[in-house]
Swiss-Prot record:
Pfam families: GTP_cyclohydroI. This is GTP cyclohydrolase 1. Pathway: Cofactor biosynthesis; 7,8-dihydroneopterin triphosphate biosynthesis; 7,8-dihydroneopterin triphosphate from GTP: step 1/1. Its EC number is 3.5.4.16. Keywords: GTP-binding, Hydrolase, Metal-binding, Nucleotide-binding, One-carbon metabolism, Zinc. It catalyses: GTP + H2O = 7,8-dihydroneopterin 3'-triphosphate + formate + H(+). It comes from Bifidobacterium longum (strain NCC 2705). GO terms for biological process: one-carbon metabolic process; tetrahydrobiopterin biosynthetic process; tetrahydrofolate biosynthetic process. Belongs to the GTP cyclohydrolase I family. PANTHER family: GTP CYCLOHYDROLASE 1, GTP CYCLOHYDROLASE I. InterPro entries: GTP-CH-I_C/QueF, GTP-CH-I_N, GTP_CycHdrlase_I, GTP_CycHdrlase_I_CS, GTP_CycHdrlase_I_dom. The lineage of its organism: Bacteria, Bacillati, Actinomycetota, Actinomycetes, Bifidobacteriales.
Amino acid sequence: MNEYIESCHREKHTYDEEGVREAVRLFLKSIGEDPEREGLVETPDRIARACRELFTGLQASPADALEKHFDVDTDELVLVKDIELYSVCEHHLLPFHGVAHVGYIPAKDGVMGLSKLARLVEVYARRPQVQERLTQQIADALVEYAGARGVIVVTECEHLCMSMRGIKKSSARTVTSAVRGMLRNPATRAEAMSLILDK
């Protein structure tokens, strides 16, 4: 687990709404706009409220998202596909969006409710992020907090920092994966990937 992930687990980040408003006003002035004109006068408030929602993952705990288990003993793969995700690229503060496919072999003490996997994706997506780390964090949390014996996470996303600026390739999608534990076995991994790719 890298230093960033550890720090997020240790600390509860606070949200400074007034600080965000002031930063937006300064940003608008810095790009040559008038933050007091009619169309922009309420923009700092709107962005401050939006960012509170977009970055709720900074205050959320992956352990809380995964806390409840059901007493079902299975060593078979559980897979939830096409979990919608929206995040913000930490390099340009532009959105990226797509889907996560999350599969795991449960711990011996039970399975999680299926909604827990979607909640876990939200915990890590709702923060300044890069897709590669997002994918790894989801996988690592399932091992660390749910005791999963095997994990596979695949994310497929479109990045607006590639679509709107720079190379401007709007149809490009980025795919990242993370595999842990029993799912590193080639046969088990192949089975999981076939289920993920089966549309």
